[in-house]
Amino acid sequence: MSDVDAAVDLAAALGDIDTATPLVNSVTNNVTVNDVANITLHWGGLPVMSDDAREVDDMVATADGCLINMGTVDEDGEESMVVAGTAANEGDKPLVVDPVGVGATPTRTRVANRLLDELDVTILNGNHGEITALAGDDADVRGVESVGEYADIAETALSCARTHDTVVVASGETDIVASPEEAYEITAGHPLMAQIVGTGCMLGVTLATFAAGMENATPLDAALAGTVGFGLAGEKAAEEGEYNGPASYKTAFLDTVAGLEAAPDDPAGRIERVLSVT
């Protein structure tokens, strides 16, 4: 069994999560909070959404993993994110950071850089534009959406991973997962996923749930398994679910995640190592 095969044994990963039932605290935005909570539950985790700086450190201390999502950032929320992330680091809990909209405004860029400077981030999750902005390159981010074209996103994600010493997931038409040593391209998903507000938010907590629930998994293992599982669930929902458009497709997607017990396709066949640092 290759390293990639082992990392993307989706049935084993889902079994681990089902056994562990990891509690994941999400400090997330008020636009997609319900979707983030539901998909945590559907993967087999337990969601909690504490975001008050007065208690979030105590909640994260009892949790198995933590997501910080910058979707709706304000002064109080910024402090809660730092408190939550610090508690995750102190408890050696997996920490996923989703720097939503970084590069769109100076405030978001400052907050994202503060989180990366002050916290030990397990997995950094963003779209192509956000990851490009954090790598210090020119990015086209409009609001919280990536609207540019990023032909060199694998190189950019690898550079970002090396700069911030973390695992990077750069989501888009093709997804890139990069550690400081190597980058993988993942081909999985469906165009309808891009028509749902909050897909990236749901991916972020998916990564946190996999990182918290998979037994003996490295951050790269969790990022690969979570990203390819998320994409394959999107494909399965499109092919087998009942829907009439984006809204009903989202329901079909969540139903598919809830019922997923094994990969509907060969996960390793969807992953290609595209860069390696020797």
UniProtKB/Swiss-Prot annotation:
Disulfide bonds: none annotated. Its cofactor is Mg(2+). Gene3D superfamilies: 3.40.1190.20. InterPro entries: Hyethyz_kinase, Ribokinase-like. GO terms for molecular function: ATP binding; hydroxyethylthiazole kinase activity; magnesium ion binding. The keyword ATP-binding applies. Its EC number is 2.7.1.50. Substrate binds at residues 49, 198. It is an enzyme of class 2 (transferase). SUPFAM superfamilies: Ribokinase-like. NCBIfam families: PRK09355.1. Catalyzes the phosphorylation of the hydroxyl group of 4-methyl-5-beta-hydroxyethylthiazole (THZ). HAMAP family: Thz_kinase. Belongs to the Thz kinase family. This is Hydroxyethylthiazole kinase. It comes from Natronomonas pharaonis (strain ATCC 35678 / DSM 2160 / CIP 103997 / JCM 8858 / NBRC 14720 / NCIMB 2260 / Gabara) (Halobacterium pharaonis).
